[in-house]
Regions:
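N-terminal beta1-alpha1 cap of cysteine-dependent amidohydrolase-like domains
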Residues: 1-92, 100-107, 118-119, 126
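Pocket-forming structural segment of enzyme catalytic cores
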Residues: 105-150
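A structural signal for conserved, well-ordered secondary-structure elements
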Residues: 95
């Protein structure tokens, strides 16, 4: 996936109860690709052929730690995991990242921050190695990125 191929990009966006960022993501994808992405309800068991599945933010099933656990067990996530296993791209944003962690698609677990309070700051990340991913294709090993974290 490259910037020049965005016009042909087929995108699906998952929708869960309580989600509130799926429509924002739909607008962003449509503006970027000039194509309307498919919105896929969490109870669906399959995906139409797509190049990218986005699991957006927005507090699926509630606003608390491990809220992604319920979403991660929704029928659509089996289809998302199958898509990824076939080499398809998957992007998890905010709560969507939590969902991908809860499904085991991403390693590790999420924990509460040490202060138990909302934190909003910039964090500098450094790429450890290059990965064969459309999201990191333009990055080199050792490159620093300033990322907002909230």
């Amino acid at each position: 996936m490259t910037l020049s191929s965005l016009a042909s990009l087929r995108v699906a966006i998952t929708v869960f109860p309580g989600s509130n960022c799926d429509r924002d993501m739909m607008v962003a994808v449509e503006q970027l690709t000039n194509r309307r992405p498919a919105l896929v309800w969490h109870k669906e068991a399959s995906l139409d052929p797509v190049d990218l599945v986005i699991v957006p933010g927005g507090f699926s099933f509630g606003d608390y730690l491990r809220c992604g656990a319920l979403a991660g067990r929704s029928p659509i996530m089996n289809a998302v995991m199958d898509h990824a296993a076939r080499g398809g791209a998957v992007l998890g944003v905010c709560n969507g990242f939590q969902v991908l962690t809860e499904t085991g698609m991403l390693p590790g677990v999420l924990i509460r921050n040490a202060g138990l309070r909302f934190s909003c700051r910039m964090v500098r990340l450094e790429t450890a190695e290059t990965m064969p991913s459309p999201f990191t294709a333009g990055l080199t090993a050792g490159q620093s990125l300033d990322i907002p974290v909230a």
